[in-house]
Regions:
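C-terminal ends and interior cores of transmembrane alpha-helices
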Residues: 85-101, 301-313
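Helix-to-loop junctions at the C-terminal end of transmembrane segments
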Residues: 63-76, 165, 277-291, 375
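Transmembrane alpha-helix termini and helix-breaking/packing motifs in multi-pass membrane transporters
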Residues: 156-179, 366-382
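A late C-terminal transmembrane helix in Major Facilitator Superfamily
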Residues: 347-378
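Cytoplasmic helix-loop-helix junction between adjacent transmembrane helices
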Residues: 112-152
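Intracellular juxtamembrane helix-capping segments at the cytosolic ends
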Residues: 119-134, 251, 331-344
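C-terminal transmembrane helical hairpin of 12-TM major facilitator-type secondary transporters
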Residues: 293-334
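Helix-loop boundary and gating motifs at the non-cytosolic
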Residues: 2-61, 220, 224-267
Length: 417
């Protein structure tokens, strides 16, 4: 296993931009919980906290694909350096505004500005890997490594944010402050590594013969969301996000009903640990199946596992089921990202990855909302019914999208079909 990852990490600059990217993606998993904890504490309202948090989320969903398109055209550092700086300053402003009990409209505006300019760091890192690596099996290993690092951020980030916001001797805005520090340290370190930055693909290059040919080739590519495979993957990721969001709510409800509310974090952490381990194993070898089969196998595995949660008699059994089901998460997401990589043109890669990442994040919000309503009405069992429904919904969408997924562009394919 170690050999596969050692092979890609020996490339000049790989370890450096991977480390920077890991730090820079922590804020994505921390801002939401930091906002809810801080605003609720300072304003005494979960509604207000939800409003400010939603502003950040909606703006991020809108802004990430736009920033990604600009990155593909003009380059990562040229676009994201000012965006990261303004996003960080907006988070500082949000912390100050909340501390002085400013009007909620000001908080929402600052939260939206911070989210809209945050970008999708995972997409930027994966784009660097794609530009650096030439062998399909190396790209597969790199994307699996990134899936594992995503899990690290999303397992540890909320725990760190909660600890900072709830520790008695620290101000409740400490979660935001930590987000700013990690965004600046990781973001500036990452964007400062110009040697590994992918070359931009301007839409109007200088009209040399070579540039004219590049322009004609770029014009031949349809918009990202006109690819059938892209639409299928985006919808699948949207539903998977809903599954993840619903699972968060259902796990908290189950642990609360069992009289151990604090154990909900352990259940969710175990779910992430399973995904982390599977990501490393999945990326350590080349799989004989085409990508669409790998995706469908992962979706079915998730659906079967998620269908068992509602029958768990105890937290211990639920944790075991979550660990086993988590094994399907990272391989499923990685195969989906790999399909994006072989579907869109190189000049559209960052945008394509940002679209599916955005779909996943939107789904989390939708799943949390719907599962929250189901849980209020029928307890954790109803919440886990929603989890299972989302899981099988993703399978159905995957099956319906198979014609497009099987026709995905095969130049540089990872699956050899």
């Amino acid at each position: 296993m170690a050999t596969s990852y050692r092979t890609i990490l020996i490339h000049p600059g790989a370890r450096s931009f991977t480390s920077a990217g890991l730090i820079a993606r922590f804020p994505m998993s921390m801002v939401g919980i930091s906002t809810i904890l801080a605003v609720e504490e300072l304003y005494g309202s979960y509604t207000a906290a939800g409003l400010v948090s939603a502003a950040n989320f909606v703006a991020m969903a809108i802004g990430a694909p736009i920033l990604a398109r600009c990155v593909d055209r003009y380059g990562q550092s040229r676009v994201m350096l000012p965006a990261v700086l303004v996003s960080s300053l907006s988070l500082v402003g949000l912390a100050v505004a909340a501390a002085v009990h400013a009007h909620l409209g000001i908080l929402a505006a600052l939260s939206a500005l911070a989210g809209g300019l945050a970008g999708s760091m995972g997409s930027l890192v994966r784009a660097r890997w794609t530009a650096m690596l030439t062998r399909p099996e190396e790209v597969h290993a790199a994307f699996s490594l990134e899936a594992a690092l995503d899990e690290v951020a999303f397992i540890l980030g909320p725990v760190l944010a909660t600890a900072l916001c709830t520790t008695p001797f620290l101000p409740v805005i400490s979660g935001w402050v930590c987000c700013v520090v990690m965004q600046l340290v990781g973001g500036l370190w990452f964007l400062g590594q110009r040697a590994t930055e992918p070359a931009p693909h301007p839409t109007r290059p200088r009209r040399t013969a070579e540039a004219a040919e590049q322009s004609d080739q770029a014009a031949a590519h349809p918009p990202v969301m006109r690819y059938g495979a892209m639409v299928s993957i985006a919808i699948v990721f949207l539903i998977l996000g809903a599954l993840f969001g619903a699972n968060d709510v259902a796990a908290v409800a189950f642990a609360t009903e069992a009289g151990h509310k604090s154990a909900s974090g352990l259940v969710l952490a175990v779910w992430g640990v399973g995904s982390f381990g599977a990501a490393l194993l999945y990326g350590s070898r080349t799989w004989g199946w085409p990508l669409w089969k790998q995706l469908m196998a992962g979706l079915v595995g998730l659906a079967v596992g998620a269908s068992t949660f509602g029958f768990a008699p105890s937290l211990v059994v639920l944790s075991v089921l979550a660990l086993l089901t988590g094994l399907a998460i990272a391989p499923t997401l990685t195969s989906g990202n790999n399909i994006v990589q072989v579907t869109v043109a190189p000049s559209q890669l960052t945008e394509g990855l940002a679209w599916v990442s955005t779909a996943l994040n939107i789904g989390v919000s939708i799943g949390s909302l719907l599962a929250g309503q189901a849980t209020d009405a029928g307890g954790s069992r109803a919440g886990y019914l929603a989890v299972a429904a989302f899981a099988w919904g993703a399978v159905v969408v995957g099956v319906l999208g198979l014609p497009a997924l099987r026709r995905a562009r095969t130049s540089g394919s990872l699956d050899g079909h």
